[in-house]
């Protein structure tokens, strides 16, 4: 291999790439690099001061936000002689970005403690700026009226300029980011329980996760039992299924629709009629039909023809479109498509019986289901377990939604399933198994309860998400862990964060979990 000095690509990169650009003092670094510098605190931390001269002590830089708003959430910062506070941090290139980007008019930025910037361009204008004195003053960026409470909650936060406070030249930090992207949290930013948990072997870690997972599972089961007392077992299950189809963005609109199921289900048996009714009730139908005839417009016209005849009957319970959130949604998770899937489930009058039969079916070797009430005794293949439930829940083919993400999207080249393995796992862990378990408990069928618990324990891990990633890094100090090979172990990790992390701050003040782990491991 040629020496590095003879590497022509290295020469190109040095002369014309990011490193070269960062040598230009008039060329600000990319904001992504500033975010990495802040996250890993590549700063001369003892020299940090706000633009007005107050000292800044960063007890924790916060966690990267994945859902818009400020760049970092949950930071713990002490400014001057004040007590440390928890809040958000926003990163911008220029101090003037606070107003230029509309942060001062955005309620999502009301908890920002510190505005971290590369240079002080605009900082004096920001300091002298006054909030609008007149109520109802227009906000040109968002073209809406600003309520007084929003204006009062969002004065400019203290500004911290870091361009001259780095712990290494900016070009060197640029190479650090490009060549060795830091994926795990630095040791000092992990939770205080991380050391205690990492001292345990995989088996003992698994025991803690399993115990937490059982707590979470039983809490979900209790929720179904409580709802069934008022609405019945079948209605409780449908509400759970709809909630799960809403994911984190649209849980409540889906729940609202499901609660009204006894009213709108009557007289709409075929899947298409149910699709039209659900899409109409949801408020997600386009307000106007297109003038030109495109590929999917025939389906939309048929839906409107169906909904037009009955919309007055349901006008008092039709949801406004504004209750739905679309930002950050994957196309496959669009609520229009999820409601189409729910319509197919509702059209299958035997769906609940199929789910109940599945709970006692022999799955590991593909044999037929056992007589109702009997529980299989042999081991279960996790892969076949997922496949067996997917066959019950999946839709073979939908004339429109197998080929489109939304009403307005182009026709796909290949049909896409309305339900994948990742969503099956969400449904089984959060809805189906807890519902089946609590029904078995009500019937005092302990044998069936144990079988359902076993399926929960062996179900393959769920799709990764930002909550799990952060929890792994904070509690286990790793991007991946062999202890998290099942969906139930993931649920256990989430439960620990709910029970302990969410009741403390980023520096783990007054958190008893590390002490409890150490006591348990030595007991």
Report each predicted region and the residues it spans.
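Intrinsically disordered, low-structural-confidence terminal and linker regions
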Residues: 1-16
């Amino acid at each position: 291999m040629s020496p590095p000095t003879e590497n022509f690509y290295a020469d190109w990169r040095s002369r014309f790439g990011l490193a070269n650009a960062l040598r230009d003092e008039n060329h600000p670094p990319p904001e992504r690099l500033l975010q990495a510098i802040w996250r890993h605190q590549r700063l001369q931390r003892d020299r940090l001061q706000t633009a007005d001269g107050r000292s800044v002590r960063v007890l924790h830089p916060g966690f990267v936000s994945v859902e818009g708003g400020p760049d970092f959430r949950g930071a713990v910062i002490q400014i001057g002689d004040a007590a440390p506070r928890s809040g958000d941090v926003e990163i911008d290139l220029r101090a003037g970005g606070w107003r230029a980007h509309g942060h001062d008019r955005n309620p999502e930025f009301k908890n920002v403690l510190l505005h971290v910037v590369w240079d002080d361009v605009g900082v004096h204008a920001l300091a002298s700026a006054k909030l609008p004195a007149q109520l109802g003053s227009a906000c040109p960026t968002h073209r809406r009226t600003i309520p007084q409470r929003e204006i009062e909650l969002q004065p400019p936060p203290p500004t911290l300029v870091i361009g001259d406070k780095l712990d290494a030249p900016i070009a060197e930090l640029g190479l650090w980011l490009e060549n060795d992207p830091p994926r795990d949290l630095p040791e000092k930013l992990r939770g205080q329980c991380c050391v205690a948990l990492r001292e345990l072997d995989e088996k003992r870690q698994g025991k803690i996760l399993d115990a937490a997972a059982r707590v979470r599972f039983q809490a979900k089961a209790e929720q179904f039992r409580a709802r069934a007392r008022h609405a019945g077992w079948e209605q409780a299950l449908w509400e759970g299924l709809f909630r799960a189809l809403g994911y984190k963005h649209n849980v409540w609109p889906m729940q609202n629709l499901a609660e009204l199921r006894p009213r709108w289900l009557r007289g709409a048996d075929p899947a298409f009629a149910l699709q039209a009714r659900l899409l109409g009730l949801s408020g997600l139908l386009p307000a106007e039909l297109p003038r030109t005839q495109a590929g999917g417009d025939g389906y939309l016209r048929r839906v409107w023809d169906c909904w037009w005849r009955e919309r007055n009957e349901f006008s008092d319970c039709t949801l406004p479109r504004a209750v739905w959130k679309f930002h950050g949604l994957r196309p496959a998770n669009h609520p229009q498509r999820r409601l189409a899937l729910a319509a197919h489930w509702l059209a299958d009058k035997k769906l609940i019986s199929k789910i109940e039969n599945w709970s006692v079916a022999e799955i590991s070797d593909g044999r037929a289901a056992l007589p109702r009430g009997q529980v299989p005794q042999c081991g279960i293949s996790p892969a076949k377990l997922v496949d067996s439930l997917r066959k019950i829940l999946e839709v073979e083919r939908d004339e429109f939604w197998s080929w489109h993400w939304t009403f307005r999207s182009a026709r796909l080249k290949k049909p896409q399933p309305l339900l994948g393995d990742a969503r099956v796992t969400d449904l089984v862990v959060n809805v189906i198994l807890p519902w089946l378990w609590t029904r078995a408990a009500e019937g005092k069928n302990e044998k069936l309860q144990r079988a359902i618990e076993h399926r929960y324990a062996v179900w393959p891990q769920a799709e990764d998400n930002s909550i799990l990633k952060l929890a792994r890094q904070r509690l286990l100090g790793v991007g991946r862990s062999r202890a998290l090979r099942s969906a139930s172990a993931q649920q256990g990790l989430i439960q620990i964060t709910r029970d302990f992390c969410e009741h403390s701050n980023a520096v783990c003040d007054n958190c008893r979990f590390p002490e409890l782990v150490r006591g348990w491991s030595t007991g």
